């Protein structure tokens, strides 16, 4: 047990046999097992106020009929990890870390919502349910299999396109990236980003964005791609150029950066 800033970080070599309630003020980290198999809980898991459970590069299984419950001011995060089971969340801290990346192979129910909730990289493979007035936004999330939305509740998935533009492997600053008519410009690193609301669900219905056309323009060079907004995406545009004129030395054109439009 280690003391870190007033909280306790606990290494748990063996999962409890039955229901497991974390101690308030503790941080429990479950990392990869020696044999690579998932951690297996013996019953319900409860994360009380001021406690935190983190999965790091691992999987956690809870029994059928059991739940992982995140109480108000409790926190549950996953870093490239999976939970096999259902989640009941009363907390706006669940999945709120930008470094979180968690797949829930089960259902998620948000209830007792006191604040709007912003989550990151949460992929729910089962159903979601939002209690009345709950507002949940997932940045870079996956579409759930089904949903139940209470009165005044809103569920949104905001996905992001990260684009890099390269000229013979070097970043291109000032290239225009247009997504459905809205434009951003690449920075000194040749990068630009655009976020869109891919899915919005409220008590009145569902709105999806679907496939969007993305255009890159730089000087005389243009290129197109399609973006399925149901998932975040990274893409590299190659905008290699060859200056017109008389060559006085060898010019090596690498296949990796083709084609090479001649600029005038």
Task: Pin down the residues of each PLM region.
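Compositionally biased low-complexity segments at domain edges in trafficked proteins
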Residues: 244-264
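Short, ordered, surface-exposed loop/turn motifs in non-cytosolic proteins
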Residues: 168-183, 187-188
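Short, acidic Ser/Thr/Gly-rich low-complexity loop/linker segments typical of extracellular
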Residues: 181-209
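A short, amphipathic beta-strand motif
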Residues: 161-167, 261-264
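The right-handed parallel beta-helix/beta-solenoid scaffold, focusing on the short coil/turn
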Residues: 6-12, 18, 24-26, 31, ...
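A short, solvent-exposed loop/turn motif at the edges and junctions
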Residues: 61, 122, 200-250
């Amino acid at each position: 047990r280690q003391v870190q800033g007033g909280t306790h970080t606990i290494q748990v070599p063996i999962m409890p046999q039955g229901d497991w309630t974390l101690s308030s003020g503790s941080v429990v980290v479950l990392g990869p097992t020696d044999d690579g198999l998932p951690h297996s809980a013996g019953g319900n898991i409860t994360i009380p106020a001021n406690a935190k459970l983190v999965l790091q590069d691992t999987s956690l299984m809870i029994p059928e009929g059991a739940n992982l419950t995140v109480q108000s001011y409790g926190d549950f995060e996953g870093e490239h990890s999976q939970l096999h089971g259902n989640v009941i969340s009363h907390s706006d801290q669940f999945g709120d870390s930008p470094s979180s990346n968690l797949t829930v192979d089960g259902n998620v129910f948000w209830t007792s919502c006191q604040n709007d909730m912003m989550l990151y990289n949460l992929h729910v493979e089962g159903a979601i349910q939002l209690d009345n007035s709950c507002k949940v936004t997932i940045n870079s999330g996956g579409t759930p299999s089904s949903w139940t939305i209470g009165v005044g509740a809103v569920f949104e998935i905001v996905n992001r396109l990260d684009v890099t533009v390269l000229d013979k492997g070097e970043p291109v600053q000032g290239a225009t990236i247009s997504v459905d008519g809205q434009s951003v410009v690449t920075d000194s690193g040749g990068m630009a980003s655009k976020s869109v609301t891919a899915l919005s669900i409220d008590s009145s219905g569902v709105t999806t964005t679907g496939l969007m056309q993305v255009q890159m323009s730089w000087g005389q060079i243009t290129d197109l791609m399609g973006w399925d907004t149901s998932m975040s995406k990274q893409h590299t545009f190659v905008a290699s150029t060859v200056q017109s004129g008389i060559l006085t030395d060898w010019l090596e054109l690498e296949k990796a950066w083709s084609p090479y439009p001649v600029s005038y």
